């Protein structure tokens, strides 16, 4: 499996592109800036889905552009995360320059222990890791773990606001 990290323009959040040489399927972990994601796709590759670590706007502000380009793309999140997709207050975009909500409806709710096959014989496993946000999910496969803001090296994670 190949992984490409993109550091996004808002709050330096990350998007990860997961691909495999034996597949045209591509998966994302979070989606911020869409342009660098599209620039890294090879001819014939299709984004199948995006796994959201949580639904604070800096982790999914590129979602509507993504869905317009890949209308069959599925958004994977927690039940609380689904609420954040459709609430500019819960996703905190209301308090920044560009309030928005998700305009699509292809959402799959994930739970602790779910395993989704992303490539032949390779699954992404789901861990519920509430703290920074009640709906935080962590994903792992092989030797990789994607924590979103549940764990930030050398940084205090904010779990509530004054």
Spans of model-derived segments:
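Accessory terminal helices/loops
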Residues: 1-2, 114, 160-161
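Short Gly/Pro-enriched turn/cap motifs at secondary-structure boundaries
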Residues: 6-8, 106-108, 128-130
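Active-site HxH/HxHxD metal-binding segment of metal-dependent hydrolases
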Residues: 33-120
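Hydrophobic "anchor" residues on beta-strands that sit immediately upstream
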Residues: 26, 50, 74, 128, ...
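Divalent metal-coordination and catalytic microenvironments
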Residues: 18, 30, 54, 66, ...
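Conserved beta-strand hairpin/beta-sheet module of binuclear metal-dependent hydrolase folds
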Residues: 1-45, 137-148, 153-154
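Conserved N-terminal entry element of GNAT/NAT acetyltransferase domains
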Residues: 1-2, 119-123
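Metallo-beta-lactamase
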Residues: 91-94, 98, 123-162
């Amino acid at each position: 499996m190949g992984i490409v990290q993109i550091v996004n323009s808002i709050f330096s959040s990350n998007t990860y592109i997961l691909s495999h040489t034996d597949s045209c399927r591509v998966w994302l972990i979070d989606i911020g800036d869409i342009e660098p994601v599209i620039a890294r796709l090879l001819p014939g590759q299709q984004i199948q889905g995006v796994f959201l670590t949580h639904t604070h706007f800096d982790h999914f502000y590129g979602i509507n552009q993504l869905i317009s380009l890949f209308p069959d793309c599925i958004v994977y999140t927690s039940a609380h995360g689904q609420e954040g997709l459709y609430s500019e207050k819960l996703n905190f975009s209301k308090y920044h320059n560009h309030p928005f909500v998700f305009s699509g409806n292809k959402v799959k709710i994930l739970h602790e222990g779910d395993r989704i096959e992303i490539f032949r014989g390779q699954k992404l496993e789901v861990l519920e890791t509430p703290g920074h946000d009640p709906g935080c999910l962590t994903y792992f496969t092989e030797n990789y773990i994607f924590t979103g803001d549940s764990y930030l090296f050398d940084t205090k994670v904010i779990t509530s606001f004054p």
